[in-house]
């Protein structure tokens, strides 16, 4: 290779990332217009398009590099020099951290995810931790109650870029003040002030004002979801001021926000204070930088592994028929490998399973489906693997494993947030906790269905419980669109003997689902059955599901709330007039 080519390649990769992030910001900047036009289908399509941008631009850069090198192979020394040149381009680059991830992605695409060593990749960042450039303008603006909180909130709302009319601005302001007074007390509220992000956070059918409520005793989140009435008028649906509520809003089971962030590292740092339980990976994920979030997630895994004496074990719960799931006992993630062969009743291919996981990545997860990161050629030290798990891996996924002596390489796996399997949770709880879990499960099914997702296998073992008590779906191999399912009533038996027969007395075609049958496996436990019948009996009726299908086919997009119905102002305070 001619000398000087290394710098050209490094510059080409960085220019490719510039193009990718420019398009990322372009799609993001259209969020306000889509919201104001109430074009919810465009919102969903923009979300998918933005997810695809990264891989598309990686592919473009790879083709450019193959042209530059005339398809010639490159030796290790050449690649190291390319990385050295690339590193020298980063000290004055504003998005250095994601640029490093982009370099990694290009390298992996060029070399088929092989030879992934720290010398060749940015396994850890080359730049000082939390290094920032001069920010062209502040990320947030401070508002002080010099003339009272009503005046302060009027200024906050008047500062918003939204061009639609407000349904009743005074009412919403008084709702917020009432909530803040109940939360802080009059005296503390008088001594508090707000810091509000300059950019709105758009997701689904809401525009979120994200801020910090700075009180004498500390800083709290200040989140206002702004919605539209059917007449296109704006209203504030609630005010959230706890870290637990904020954590759910920015949760791993939700779609990524669209927030204009030319300097994502600075925004992530600003968010840390109100989301103390979120890792760096989770914060990048929340603002849509999902590929860099994957890098940060891998770094978090490596740091944990270096500091623990644990071995990987099979994850607790009922063993799956499609996926082999393992974890580190103290780590908050699970690792999922597609088995070489599935149980006989699972008539599907590995390609189908991967397509289901990609569907979830691109779809609106409505807070009810866990996000995943996909890895290829994942290296594990044998000393970190328990003997029982090693035996299981070789038994169930040998075709995906390469033995390197002291290491194994798993050709493909997913990493996902670890949760308590719902079936285990239900065995351990009683009283109100049991009731809450059943309510959550039914709500999860309803919200998934309203978002055009049918889980397929609705057994409790396929759902998990988060640390906030939310029920989230995580087994995707039978997932499909609601509109692909034929929901049927079971025909009445022709003769009394029909009900005793081993075979059904009616025909069953692929895609047929009989909701009446759900009762058999969801209500078998006498502690659970009465609760289910009380709260979710309509899930056992085919007409309920068909009505949802009709709404979806008519183009209706349901509202998705990242908080309980009882937290909505309209429920808490009613239509109070001001």
Swiss-Prot record:
GO terms for cellular component: cytoplasm. GO terms for biological process: glucose metabolic process; glyoxylate cycle; tricarboxylic acid cycle. ATP binds at residues 315-321, 336. Changing residue 336 to M: Inhibits enzyme. Changing residue 377 to A: No loss of activity. Pfam families: AceK_kinase (PF06315), AceK_regulatory (PF20423). This is Isocitrate dehydrogenase kinase/phosphatase.
